Each structure stands twice: as C-alpha cells, then as structure tokens.
Amino acid sequence: MDKKATRLRRAKKTRAKLGSQDRARLCVHRTPKHIYAQIISSDGSSVVASCSTVQADIKKQVAFGGNKEAAELVGKSIAEKAKAAGIESVAFDRSGFKYHGRVQVLADSARENGLQF
C-alpha cells in the first residue's frame, strides 16, 4: 500500500466511528501549500461552514498557506463561522492525517476560539 491509500483507509475507519454520533463534523484536509476545514452537518448532507487558506481574507494575512500560522488563522475563522451558524460542539475528523503539526494547530486554535470537540 502506498501512503495515500493508507491515509484513506484510516480516514474511512474514523468516519465510520464518527458517523454514529449525532454531532456536526469538523473535517480537515491538508496539502503541501494549503489547509482546508469544513463543518459538515450531523446527517452528513450539507456543509454548514468552510474555510481555507485559498480564501482571499486569509490569503492577505499570510505569505504562505502551508505553515502553522496559516493553520491557526483557519482554525480561528472556522470556529467563528461555526458559532455564527449556531454550532457549539463538533466531532474532529482529521481525514487520516496524523494529529501533529498543522492539523494539531488548527484544532487547538478552533478550541481556543470556543469550539468544543
């Protein structure tokens, strides 16, 4: 198995466990240049809020989207958007990525700004 297939297998197992919970899901995806976060409704049918380093307001604040500073801004922004949509508590879906580095910084930033995991 290659790295991508292994990551997708881990993500599938995680989503199977998260699917049984009746909470919205904070789904994170990272690439070498950007990081993306989405809050998906508890039934999985719609995206309630989304944020990424591709968006103009965040792109203005950071020089490069693939670092921890950018992940911190995305975490703060997604927490604010979740609060505006009336979501206080989410399940964290790291999409098979290790809870380390940019993924961890995004999660910590979202927690600091009022989102409960």
From Swiss-Prot:
- Keyword Transmembrane: yes or no? no
MF annotations from Gene Ontology: 5S rRNA binding; structural constituent of ribosome
Keyword set, alphabetical order: Ribonucleoprotein, Ribosomal protein, RNA-binding, rRNA-binding
What's one Pfam family the UniProt record gives for this protein?
A: Ribosomal_L18p
Gene Ontology CC, one term: cytosolic large ribosomal subunit
Q: Which residues cross the membrane?
A: none
Gene Ontology biological process terms in this record: translation
Subunit structure and binding partners: Part of the 50S ribosomal subunit; part of the 5S rRNA/L5/L18/L25 subcomplex. Contacts the 5S and 23S rRNAs.
Q: Which family does it belong to?
A: Belongs to the universal ribosomal protein uL18 family.
Q: State what this protein does.
A: This is one of the proteins that bind and probably mediate the attachment of the 5S RNA into the large ribosomal subunit, where it forms part of the central protuberance.
The record, for PANTHER family, names: 39S RIBOSOMAL PROTEIN L18, MITOCHONDRIAL, LARGE RIBOSOMAL SUBUNIT PROTEIN UL18M
Q: What is this protein called?
A: Large ribosomal subunit protein uL18
Q: Which organism is it from?
A: Hydrogenovibrio crunogenus (strain DSM 25203 / XCL-2)
Q: Which gene encodes it?
A: rplR
